[in-house]
Amino acid sequence: MATIFIDGQAGTTGIEIATRLRAREDLTLLTIAEDERKDPAAREKLFQQADVAILCLPDDAAISACELANGQCRLLDASTAHRTHSDWVYGLPELNAAARMAIASADKVSNPGCYPQGFILSAVSYTHLRAHETQQHL
């Protein structure tokens, strides 16, 4: 059973993710008391207990959270802070099998965001369609 900590669980994104994860019997969701949400020591303790931490924070706070986590658990970042960072895997499994494999084995996965995700998937679909049409005309 995997243990999950949502850093930023009181915000909209954190609430939505927590709601979905609570429905899963194969996961344990760690929670932090409201008065400890900004306490670095309390958060660091939860990072140590977690298998995976989901960062639902503003960019600067997400960067700081990575320092608190200090490589003790896998990180999924919902902010824009690490989207193009070379140490993070771009979390778009629908892209291709290589992307799925990279995400599955990564310690740090960035959220692609809704606008980039929509564009990339549309562009990839269009490119595949055009390639298929070209193949048929040869």
Residue spans of the language-model regions?
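N-terminal Rossmann-fold NAD(P) dinucleotide-binding loop
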Residues: 14
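Extreme N-terminal starter segment of soluble prokaryotic enzymes
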Residues: 1-4
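N-terminal Rossmann NAD(P)H-binding glycine-rich loop of SDR-like oxidoreductase domains
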Residues: 10
